[in-house]
Amino acid sequence: MPEQPKKVADRYLKQEVLGQGTYGVVFKATDTKTEQTVAIKKIRLGKQREGVNITALREIKMLKELKHPHIILLIDAFPHKENLHLVFEFMETDLEAVIRDSNIFLSPADIKSYLLMTFKGLAYCHDKWVLHRDMKPNNLLIGVDGQLKLADFGLARIFGSPNRKFTHQVFARWYRAPELLFGAKQYGAAVDVWAVACIFAELLLRRPFLQGNSDIDQLSKIFAAFGTPKADQWPDLTKLPDYVEYQFVPAPSLRSLFPAVSDDALDLLSKMFTYDPKARISIKQALEHRYFTSAPAPTDPAKLPKPVPKQDGKSSYGKHEAITVQSPPRKLRRVMPERGRVDSLKSHVDKDQQAPMSLDFTILAERPPNRPTITSADRSHLKRKLDLEFQ
């Protein structure tokens, strides 16, 4: 006999589980008042019922203020049985599932459509002085109508205040800008732009672009793709807290990494992957780039291809040939700094990994990747009274 739906706080009829994470579970439900299908994120509150972890508190605060067609709608929030429930509009899938599905052919017009929706949502955030700080394909949700929406604002912050410092341990590593990997604590919207550039590349390649297995290795992947930055490219590089000098590696042509893309797409990618965050194109400027006005026109979201649900949950990554960048000779790969600087940099490598003394410059791995999560971000809990009033 199938499991009977369970009611949550009387109004919502819980159905199947959609996913699980560190803090709780997301499940599909029906709003018995409106008959609307919704997604409910259940988050453990902890010992004090009035308390809430800081990530959930920030997400509620941000989403109550951000209202846009390409940002997920938070419908309701309520505590129930020592859990906090966040009620969102139901979204059918996410961009990661689209990229992974080898049965889906993504045309240049399809890719442009997904990027246009992503850029519009992020531009709205930046107009409101909000950094997302966790841009990645599985945080870009797609509805039954094909509309893409930014989700997961737990790491979002208000920016723009002079001298305000943030943690540099944000974003999943593969989407982390080089200034963050070098320990920058004062940064702005450019970090989101770099992450979206990585998503752009992932849509083109149908696999993650820069797959580092530590912060040091992530930098090696970036330098292999774009060359070691020079002083005239990034004047403030040596001032960053965790700066370490690397042996110069020449950049391959961007065309060699993306051989099939249009000149306009390649030009936009190069501007988004600019090393110096002060010179990196803004998301608003990116929306005005000729890539979005040149042919082909973006696909109507309602006509975008959708992934077929996989019963075994296996990834289709790893079925394509890897694109690699030739490494320089091992002894020239990195200039070894003083011992103290090495120890400083090692402190940013995951505890269960050793800082590699030689670096692998492969851009795309052959094996199915283990997608990293933000394990090093501040996960402390704050006990606060929670405003759950919705207009």
Swiss-Prot record:
Record note on what altering residue 41 to R does: Prevents autophosphorylation
InterPro entries named in the record: CDK, CDK7, Kinase-like_dom_sf, Prot_kinase_dom, Protein_kinase_ATP_BS, Ser/Thr_kinase_AS
Known outcome of mutating residue 161 to A: Reduces phosphorylation by CDKF-1 by 20%. Abolishes phosphorylation by CDKF-1
Tissues showing expression: Expressed in roots, shoots and suspension cell culture.
Gene Ontology terms for molecular function: ATP binding; cyclin-dependent protein serine/threonine kinase activity; protein kinase activity; protein serine kinase activity; RNA polymerase II CTD heptapeptide repeat kinase activity
EC number(s) on file: 2.7.11.22, 2.7.11.23
Role noted for this protein: May form a stable complex with cyclin CYCH1-1 that phosphorylates human CDK2 and the C-terminal domain (CTD) of the large subunit of RNA polymerase II.
Post-translational modification Phosphotyrosine, affected residues: 23
PROSITE patterns registered for this protein in UniProt: PROTEIN_KINASE_ATP, PROTEIN_KINASE_DOM, PROTEIN_KINASE_ST
Region (Disordered): 294-321, 337-391
Catalytic activity: L-seryl-[protein] + ATP = O-phospho-L-seryl-[protein] + ADP + H(+); L-threonyl-[protein] + ATP = O-phospho-L-threonyl-[protein] + ADP + H(+); [DNA-directed RNA polymerase] + ATP = phospho-[DNA-directed RNA polymerase] + ADP + H(+)
Protein name: Cyclin-dependent kinase D-3
PANTHER family membership: CELL DIVISION PROTEIN KINASE, CYCLIN-DEPENDENT KINASE D-3
Gene Ontology cellular-component terms listed: nucleus; transcription factor TFIIK complex
Disulphide bridges: none
Superkingdom assignment: Eukaryota
Name of the encoding gene: CDKD-3
Organism: Arabidopsis thaliana (Mouse-ear cress)
Modified positions (Phosphothreonine) in chain numbering: 167
Residues found modified as Phosphoserine: 161
Binding positions for ATP per the UniProt entry: 18-26, 41
